[in-house]
Amino acid sequence: MNQGFIKVAAGTPQVTVADCKANTRAILEVIREMETQHAKLMVLPELCITGYTCQDLFLQRRLLDSAWESLLTIAEETADVDALIFVGLPMRMNGKLYNVAAALNHGNILGFVPKTHIPNYNEFYEQRHFASGADVWTDVTVGEESVPFASNLIFSCEGLPELTVGAEICEDLWVPLPPSVNLAQGGAHIIVNLSASDEMVGKESYRRDLVKGQSARLVCGYIYATAGEGESSQDLVFGGQNLIAENGTMLAEAKRFQNTVIYGEIDVQRLADERRRLSTYPASDDADCQIVPFEVEVEETSLTRKFAPYPFVPSVKEERDMRCEEILNIQAMGLKKRMSHIHCQKAMVGLSGGLDSTLALLVIARTFQLMGLPSENIRCITMPCFGTTDRTYQNACKLSQCLGAALTEVNIKEAVNIHFRDIGHDDSVHDVTYENCQARERTQILMDMANQEGALLVGTGDLSELALGWATYNGDHMSMYGVNASVPKTLVRHLVRYYADTCGEKELEEVLLDILDTPVSPELLPPKDGKIAQKTEDLVGPYELHDFYLYYMLRAGFEPDKIYRIACRTFEGTYDKATILKWLKIFYRRFFAQQFKRSCLPDGPKVGSVALSPRGDLRMPSDASAAVWMEALEKLEV
């Protein structure tokens, strides 16, 4: 469980209606199976000790006595199981019958959570048998122990403070104000739901959405264990659709109509960090809850969950296309507002034939369509110099032509050579000065020509470059409005590809596809045999790794060793551990060292959950030390 990952399980035993001894054997069999997978939190269905469909047999004393005896047996038989276990049963108390979840840990019964909302509509008539536990807060004597009985219990792990668990039962989730809301506000990072939800057409997707939505709304893990085969089919069928969700993401789902166990690793540290980040999330002491301690051994959890290698890019094409369309619209609407505000009808962009300037031009073209402005008011400036290749030059020319934009070529070789002479720089020394002189010359030309034309200079730099500081200060770092500032490099490719696929123009599509096939490069060093010699990813590392690091550092707040661990799992077979660690160190070093560039960024629209604007998402001092983070990385062993 180190780094916050906790192995959880939801299982459906094969019940025999009203046969508590048979059900006890089935429940213990499921628990033992969960134990082999090292689950530390185990959840079984509602009323699983008796079966949910006992109907009026719940009024029989013999059944209730047998259920209680079975609970004691299950507790005794699981004394050696290192887990917090939830099982469901009917329980008498103070002249009423309650539908409860019993929490077990190392042979001890820790507490009883009664069902709050008792359905009595359509196929449900639970009020015939059960009372609501909404206003019940008392203790029950079990042997020589006093055990709490209430709907507001939170079970807290003594060895891992973020592992806090609350319980609700079936219908409790389906009401306007579920008990889980109060439990989450009280500090529960995981909600378990013991359910017996019958099947009917359309209910599967609704149930899934309900669990996902509640986990997102409460910023929690949600474990849903429901009844399955073995329940009476007199009038209903139960499908066993067990679900495990974390903050809006489905981690595991059982195939229906099979009694199975599902597993997942919920990251309770991330949930705690996310709640702390949200200033509107109530503090834990705002809710009236009772804390019940439990113990499990805090050990390393073997990870089976998958982490998206491209967290900024949806893996499903339909969703990805929708995302691309949305992002292009956000970028265009941001630029439209700025141009409208300053009464500007012209835009200028430095066009290199690379990905970023291509995307910026596509956004400008869409903006002009929205504003009803002529495409010739788009001024594209291409500025070849020492590193420019024929491929990128030709693509820049073709792209501007396809979009109907005006293209001007300004060869900057002579100007840069004059500048070298002015500052006494040897043009055979290809150092940072050699490169930055070109970048700043281009920016000066663009700024001045924008003034000449009365145009808005649109910046092209993307989120990944800003994170790494891969931009020349007051060179390509500067513009009048940066449309790509919150678009990571891995997403830039998909945006350009989406535009190519949907533009409906063959020539434009071919140009965009060739740009996509061109190596990423600033083209500041002379080419070799007419081909790009300076490749960005050879110098600063693969953007797919850096975008992965960026997402989990800023969006998830993960520590360096945690990012390293999940990166090794995610990119296994693509990069070895040494390579992953090498570029992770470079990422942290550059991210801290280059903050001064981000502290004075031009305006630009936020499009995703990760952004670096000093006016919005990242308030970070330019002179902060990376020592604490680098120290953690130095301790890692490859």
What are these regions (language model features)?
Residues 18, 23, 161-163, 219-220, ...:
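ATP/NTP-dependent adenylation/nucleotidyl-transfer catalytic domains that generate, transfer
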